[in-house]
Design a protein with these regions (language model features):
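Domain-level signal for Mg2+-assisted phosphodiester chemistry and nucleotide/NA-binding surfaces
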Residues: 1-105, 152, 159-162
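Nuclease catalytic cores that cleave nucleic-acid phosphodiester bonds
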Residues: 86-195
């Protein structure tokens, strides 16, 4: 099997699992999920780059924030000894909206993913195909650059034609890719973890 690298936007993956779980996150084996996406294209995962952000921590952190951080650290530690898995970390920003309600947004996650996409050839010069699990059109410039250098981009994402839905994004990211795999609920359920 030909080797590939997989680049994962965890924020997108989490939103999609919640969407397919009808408002509840589907807990699933991420490594098996990623390997299965590659297997659909007869590819072997050489390395995964997983872009995420640790949960927001106030000063001092609340009990809920501490609990979220413990869960994140436990999740991250599961992968810390794997040589085929790299965490790319941004941060979470907390702001208040006009109604005084806190809102949380990931910051820098797309940037660290773009950095990894732009530099992987130094460590993996023989890779000719990569898989991107994301939905953000901000990745189009780097994808276009990679395609111009002979890299095939396989986008694994979810897109709906219905306007004003959570996944009714621009078709532009699909157009920037070489191939498109539409993720399904079954992709998650096939690797569902029991509590």
């Amino acid at each position: 099997m030909e080797e590939t690298l997989v680049f994962v936007d965890e924020g997108f993956l989490a939103r999609l699992s919640k969407y397919f779980g009808n408002g509840k996150y589907i807990k699933f084996d991420k490594i098996s999920f990623i390997k299965n996406i590659a297997k659909k294209k007869d590819l072997f995962v050489k390395h995964t780059f997983y872009a995420t952000a640790p949960p927001f921590q106030g000063t001092p952190p609340s009990e809920d924030e501490k609990k979220r951080k413990e869960g994140y650290d436990k999740f991250k530690n599961k992968f810390s000894n794997r040589k085929d898995f790299t965490f790319l970390e941004g941060r979470v920003q907390r702001t208040k909206n006009k109604e005084g309600i806190f809102q949380y947004r990931q910051k820098g996650v797309d940037t660290v993913m773009t950095m990894a996409l732009s530099s992987f050839r130094a460590d993996y010069p023989t890779i000719k195909k990569i898989i991107l699990i994301a939905c953000d059109t901000d990745f189009c410039p780097i994808l276009e650059m990679l395609k111009s250098k002979g890299i095939e981009i396989i986008l694994a994402s979810y897109y709906e034609r219905k306007r004003n839905t959570e996944f009714s994004r621009s078709h532009h990211l699909i157009d920037c890719s070489s191939e498109y795999i539409k993720l399904t609920k079954e992709d998650f359920l096939n690797f569902k973890l029991e509590k």
